[in-house]
């Protein structure tokens, strides 16, 4: 792994109390409902649903996730759905750094398909 660990955050970058308040409000007002709706959709990974493409559940959760990301109205957000034959689609989005001199990258990875 090339990422530096335990690096100090520059002062003034983020007010922890403001961030916590925002995250708590979002969690209570939006995210819990989004997660509740998501877990009701049986979007199983191909290893557990050979008819995943025909069933369309992964397509549904992908569309819902893309709509949620776009609804956040993040400045500079670029969203793309990457499709390869025979593979589950990938939701890829990129947000440029807020400071031009920033050379750091943050990678977040998750799955929209599930396992029973």
Task: Annotate each language-model stretch with its function.
Residues 2-116:
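Acidic/His- and Gly-rich active-site-bordering loop/insert found
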